[in-house]
């Protein structure tokens, strides 16, 4: 299943127990950003550059959904291959989570460490923080600019910022990674030209596209046999059991 998913265009994975709660949220995101989804053909055929901004709530499910939305788009535009899609996914996901956790939710390194050691799930802490209206009303702004050569991204939260230099300096106590704290370095490893504003609540980075990359169909369907239908041929009837 994991290997099959590597080549798919999945926007979000929802467990059955959370289907009733999470599916409407994912569908709202897709509906809200349908213009972005339908820009693919226009972009590859007519437009050289597209840009925009996603406004996100402090919800980890949204992070996964928006990350897949962007990386799948670039993959389907033939701008990145599957390996680079995974690298970009890591960079975007880690920096968006940092914006929510440490920016809007003001979760300190020590607080996160204690929570992970005791309970093991940072998502529960984020949702606990969001019970406060002052936290819940904050937003993360995820901006993009996509050109044929590269994609540029900016992520800005409404928090107080942080001293980002200490987290990329290996000699700094906070630079020595322990139970967590890998996000900034991982993003810097996979993306290029990672830069912060002086306040530390905004990060920008670039991701170079593959040259002459061609992705005709999703990898998950590469081994599927092509089926050609004739005009007026009946493909299936209502109530018939699927063979897939």
Identify the function of each model-found stretch.
Residues 1-38, 198:
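Output/docking surface of receiver
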Residues 1-11, 123-125, 147, 232:
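Non-catalytic regulatory/interaction regions at protein termini and inter-domain linkers
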Residues 21, 34-62:
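CheY-like receiver
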Residues 43-51, 100-228:
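Conserved beta-strand-loop-beta-strand hairpin that lines the nucleotide-binding pocket
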Residues 50-81, 156, 160, 164:
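Helix-loop-beta hinge of the Bergerat
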Residues 71-93, 115-118, 174-178:
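Conserved short strand/loop->alpha-helix "switch" segment adjacent to the catalytic nucleotide/phosphoryl-transfer site
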Residues 94, 98:
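Conserved polar catalytic motif of the HATPase_c/GHKL fold
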Residues 227-244:
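Regulatory nucleotide-sensing modules
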């Amino acid at each position: 299943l994991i290997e099959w998913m590597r080549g798919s265009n999945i926007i979000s994975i929802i467990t059955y127990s959370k289907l009733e709660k999470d599916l409407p949220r994912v569908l709202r995101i897709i509906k809200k950003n349908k213009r972005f989804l339908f820009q693919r053909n226009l972009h590859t055929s007519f437009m050289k550059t597209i840009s925009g901004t996603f406004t996100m709530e402090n919800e980890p499910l949204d992070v996964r959904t928006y990350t897949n939305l962007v990386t799948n788009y670039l993959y389907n535009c033939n701008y990145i291959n599957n390996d680079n899609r995974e690298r970009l996914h890591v960079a975007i996901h880690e920096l968006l989570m940092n914006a929510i956790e440490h920016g809007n939710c003001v979760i300190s390194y020590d607080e996160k460490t204690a929570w992970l050691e005791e309970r093991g799930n940072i998502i529960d802490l984020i949702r606990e923080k969001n019970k406060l209206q002052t936290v819940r009303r904050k937003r993360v702004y995820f901006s993009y600019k996509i050109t044929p050569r590269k994609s540029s991204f900016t992520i800005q939260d409404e928090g107080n910022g942080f001293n980002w230099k200490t987290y990329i300096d290996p000699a700094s106590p906070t630079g020595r990674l322990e139970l967590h704290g890998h996000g900034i370095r991982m993003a810097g490893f996979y993306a290029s030209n990672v830069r912060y504003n002086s306040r530390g609540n905004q990060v920008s980075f670039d991701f170079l596209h593959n040259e002459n990359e061609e992705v005709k169909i999703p990898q998950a369907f590469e081994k599927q046999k092509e089926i050609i239908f004739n005009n007026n041929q009946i493909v299936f009837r209502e109530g018939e059991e699927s063979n897939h």
